[in-house]
Amino acid sequence: MVSKRKLSKIDAAEESSKTDLQSRCPETKRSRISDKRAPSQGGLENEGVFEELLRTSGIILKVGEGQNEIAVDQTAFQKKLRVALEKHPSYPGVVNEFISGLESHIKDRSQFKNCLLPCTPARTEGSRTLVHSYCESLIKLLLGIKILQPAVVTLLLEKIPEFFFDVVGTFGTNFPRLIVNQFKWLDGLLDSQDLVKKLMQMLSVSPVPIQHDIITSLPEILEDSQQNEVARELSCLLKQGRRLTVPILDALSRLDLDAELLAEVRQSAMTIVPSVKLEDLPVVIKFILHNVKAADAVEVISDLRKSLDLSSCVLPLQLLGSQRKLKSQAQASSSMSQVTTSQNCVKLLFDVIKQAVRFQKDVSEAWIKAIENSTSVSDHKVLDLIVLLLIHSTNSKNRKQTEKVLRSKIRLGCMPEQLMQNAFQNHSMVIKDFFPSILSLAQTFLHSAHPAVVSFGSCMYKQAFAVFDSYCQQEVVCALVTHVCSGNETELDISLDVLTDLVILHPSLLLRYATFVKTILDSMQKLNPCQIRKLFYILSTLAFSQRQEGSYIQDDMHMVIRKWLSSSVPNHKQMGIIGAVTMMGSVALKRNEADGGLLERPELSIECDGQLSTLLDLVGFCCEQTPEVLALYYDELANLIEKQKGNLDLQLLDKFGKSLVEDFPNDFVVDLSPTVDGSFLFPVKSLYNLDEDETQGAIAINLLPLVSQSEPGRVADEMSNSRKRVVSPICLSPCFRLLRLYTGEQNNGSLEEIDALLGCPLYLTDLEVEGKLDSLSKQEREFLCSLLFYALNWFREVVNAFCQQQDAEMKGKVLTRLQNITELQNVLGKCLAATPGYVPPPATFDSEAPEGVPSINAGGPVRKKNGKKRKSDSSKACSAERTQADESSDGNQPDTELSELEKSATEKETGNPLAQLQSYRPYFRELDLEVFSVLHCGLLTKSILDTEMHTEASEVVQLGPAELCFLLDDMCWKLEHVLTPGSTRRVPFLKERGNKDVGFSHLCQRSPKEVAVCVVKLLKPLCNHMENMHNYFQTVIPNQGVVDESGLNIQEYQLMSSCYHQLLLAFRLLFAWSGFSQHENSNLLRSALQVLADRLKPGETEFLPLEELISESFQYLLNFQASIPSFQCAFILTQVLMAISEKPMTGWKREKMASLAKQFLCQSWMKPGGDREKGSHFNSALHTLLCVYLEHTDNILKAIEEISSVGVPELINSAKDGCSSTYPTLSRQTFPVFFRVMMAQLESSVKSIPAGKPSDSGEVQLEKLLKWNIAVRNFHILINLVKVFDSRPVLSICLKYGRLFVEAFLKLAMPLLDHSFKKHRDDVQSLLKTLQLSTRQLHHMCGHSKIHQDLGLTNHVPLLKKSLEQFVYRVKAMLAFNHCQEAFWVGVLKNRDLQGEEILSQASAAPEEDSAEGSEEDTADSAAEEPDGTDSDSGGAGR
């Protein structure tokens, strides 16, 4: 141990002489150091200048494992060593010797390591050290001595290359890192520039690990003045490679950079986001988010959204699914490791985002805004959905905003369900943390009135159940049960649908929570028949899929069903039948699957069969006395056979089938005879016989006698008799449906046994009712109506039954039956018009009875929007503009309450029976989807028959226009009901929801995809019919939009026009289906597009990419524009093209859409009678079409200016009932529509002009000023139109959108004017002067509204005046900012009316108040009071 005694001056001199002697013999010293090793106690035996000076200064060098020791304070050591060196006789040469000694000493790696590691305080026995517990390393201490620093720095940098090729850890130490660490936090660095320069040079040649160490140490080495320069170099390095991303960003985040450089570096980081390694991605994102400023947060987040693609993170996750296929267990283990790593990286990524969102308010709001600003459907990603969920769960303040944005995106189709499925399936580890938010949002979405939002909420439930743990699954089930028990129709239906999907996809999982589902049985009174069917399907599937576990559910179901069947309440009996038949379906399924009944014990199957037989007997006994209940039983059994086609036990079929085969002929069929015995209200006549050549064994449907027997008095007589079963015509169609499905099931689809029923006649009466109805009594008219309803429903079921038969003769008979239906509908329409208050017999029995008495109105719609009646046009005498505007104040917006079909039905011509019978749809039997296979038949119009008289039409029966219109109308109703559009209308009010499934019972048992597949198969015949329509209208409309009425058959024209309308609507309903956005339906979409594209390129479309198929389909449909017969057809064609072009919308399609919409707007739409098309629905379509034109045109401001500067003046100069010659759709009646759209689109377009920035170049400023100049000019033109068109709706539009425009100007234009005023003073002054004129007119409107005390208008006034006042002060602030207050002057702004006349009551009071109160000011804007009450000069113009 070396003694710690202090050296005297003599000792110091002796040491110096020794040092001097040693310095003269360097060779000897080096050989000693290199050859001689330390003794066992760890000291050095032979000392040189280096060792001696260190020892005398207080450092004891150690070799081996021991660290160097320091006996004095660090600063004392440095001072002693510096003094010793400076006073050494050979100074400054001694410095070189000292460095040489250091160099020799650190050749040994263990000694070098000791010099790089912190020294330890030297301790002596029995004494306490005064040295601090932590001491720097020897090298660090030497670097703190200025005379040694340059040489030590050079020595250390030269040592680094020695370790280039060392594997870290070879010697147990990372030497490069230790070396670089010595340069950190040096207080007295002599040449910082040189050190950093050498380090950067070293960086360029070093291996990656050493580069990593150097970069991460730079922030602690650099001086403040060097940070920006080095940051630029690091930014360049960041762009060159991806291996140093993490250390570079780590270093940059610790540097104090100026704003410009920070933006540049952040942009560099942004560019590498798409290609950076997954494990480095969290670091990159953290750097970007933590260095974002409030001013550019939205821009940065928007760029980040575009760059960050989670699909690259999914690729490793896909290995999880394929790992089972790997033969090697080692490979499988490796795959699992990769998947885990990938999931952890994604988790870290969202943890980074979560931290930024939680602690940086700007980031949270900017992310929401960035998602909100994204408009294209293709721009939205899984990332957006996850971030919205993250913000919703993290920031309580942003929850409402987040929910609003998510709702909006779902409604617009930007957040398809496929996107959500990807999020749940690929990132479940991340999303599980947001489960409370997911549950909350799903519950909220189910309350929505928008089908797309409701569907999204239900999908959230399904995905959460599928991918989360048991706790989450239980919460999902409890939430769904709560929805069902809430009594809300929408929630109830959707929740049951979700549970149905879950029981199909995850029966074993749902069975765990069957106890919760079973509690719904306690709330059965709230369920309608369709909902009961769904519930019992769910419970039956759970009860019978695994017999032992589900036995307790079976007992409860039996108990409830028996209770209902025994009830005397018809509604309860109805519920019991539906429950019983649904349960039968689950019991009677063939057990041939691996988990089916073949593996079960025989006695269990016998027990179930016994239960089933007992249940069947009970149901049959309870039904036989009530026709409606018996008809329901027949329908439910028929639905069961159809749904489980081929899977039902044959014994069950035989049990009720044999009696059915016997009962139907006995009850409803009689032998055909010339006369019928009995007394009836009308003489019996056999009609519609298609088998007149078959006289022997002919049969007929005994309809009229049965209808006579079913009258109330006769039914009572029958009930008093001892008959067990009542025969009613109500049961005719349901019983036949069950018979034909039973027969088809037993005979592999063949209906040969009952084909006589297709052509057999009906016992009706003479149906030539023209002119006879007025002479009939009410009872006779109602009897006749009932007879026609029964006949129509019989024919509809016959068509359902035989439409798929391949025999040519039977096909012909089916087409004839369709003709019979259209003929009977004409007769029925006339009868119903003469029989007000008549309620038809029921035709559907599994839905609640429609409320109220249906009515028929051949001249117009049954109901108006919001259920309100239209006021009489003659109520007041006022201007044409005011009258029409008041009528259409609500009609100029797209109608959200009526469906497309309801809207079209209200405007159809009086001659179309379909328009008359719309309100009676619930009283007709439902057509099956298979009926539409008849559309494959060709179209034969009367005009073709007239020109080909030699052709006998009886030889080939083809589909006529009336039959085509009938089929298309029904198909469109079905499609609209089941295919939810991506951007959808609102659901009708909840009070109407109870009847929404009436007439769609069979359809609702099919999934939307099944319906879509069916329609895609029909696209070829639909295209054929469309082309026939196109050819027809090209001949009758030789000039664009002008009907050639010479020799025109008006009725045929109307029918063909209706067919065209329905065809286009069918295309729109199909291609707007939201399901096409889901990945699993992509092949179906391709098949649909391929059919359309094949019409232009036959045989060339099979291998075309999707984008080309879309383009060809778009072009095919675009070709129909020349033959469009009505504005409604034009509107729907535009919607079809929109639906197709959005997948995706490209530049040339936008141009075509704008051109097409403008063409329709510039076309004169006339009816065949010569009247101009008009009405609220015309206005609604016009609103949408005008929006399409302005949204897709290249220059929206120019388009608005053209309409307002060309079209409107033409209208003003035209006659009272005239229109614009350039835009014939612009008339005094439609002006409010044009005005609203132009104002809304103008306000929307200026919001897209970026706000002015100080950094904008002069050219950019000028371009923005030009845009604002045009916008303000358009605004001025539109506002001044109020002087001519002063109706209340126009004023309301002005006040609303005027305020929004001024607010947008304040937010976006004023910053631009601040920075461009000096450079472009004249332009700014001109802009403000023009705007001043507009805002002055707005002020006049405020006065006008107050004078007339119109509450609808005055509600807008306070907010508008506030905006105008803000504008005044904002202009003053701009002038002050530019030191140019004299550029404008202010004056008194007087209150005037719309025509500019001063309001007298205020004019007389003005002189008195002028001196006492503050005056309203008029700068570049309008009305604002000076808060300080100062007077201003009268006037108000800018200089």
Curated annotation (Swiss-Prot):
It is found in: Nucleus. There is a cross-link at K563 (Glycyl lysine isopeptide (Lys-Gly) (interchain with G-Cter in ubiquitin)). GO terms for cellular component: nucleoplasm. Pfam families: FancD2. Keywords: Isopeptide bond, Nucleus, Ubl conjugation. It comes from the Eukaryota. InterPro entries: FANCD2. Its main location: nucleus. Monoubiquitinated on Lys-563 during S phase and upon genotoxic stress. Deubiquitinated by USP1 as cells enter G2/M, or once DNA repair is completed. Monoubiquitination prevents DNA release from the FANCI-FANCD2 complex. FANCD2 is only ubiquitinated in the FANCI-FANCD2 complex and the monoubiquitination of FANCD2 is promoted by phosphorylation of FANCI. Phosphorylated in response to various genotoxic stresses by ATM and/or ATR. The keyword Ubl conjugation applies. GO terms for biological process: DNA repair. Required for maintenance of chromosomal stability. Promotes accurate and efficient pairing of homologs during meiosis. Involved in the repair of DNA double-strand breaks, both by homologous recombination and single-strand annealing. The FANCI-FANCD2 complex binds and scans double-stranded DNA (dsDNA) for DNA damage; this complex stalls at DNA junctions between double-stranded DNA and single-stranded DNA. May participate in S phase and G2 phase checkpoint activation upon DNA damage. Homodimer; cannot be ubiquitinated and does not bind DNA. Part of a FANCI-FANCD2 heterodimeric complex that binds and scans dsDNA for DNA damage. Interacts directly with FANCE and FANCI. Interacts with USP1 and MEN1. The ubiquitinated form specifically interacts with BRCA1 and BLM. Both the nonubiquitinated and the monoubiquitinated forms interact with BRCA2; this interaction is mediated by phosphorylated FANCG and the complex also includes XCCR3. The ubiquitinated form specifically interacts with MTMR15/FAN1 (via UBZ-type zinc finger), leading to recruit MTMR15/FAN1 to sites of DNA damage. Belongs to the Fanconi anemia protein FANCD2 family. This is Fanconi anemia group D2 protein. The gene is FANCD2.
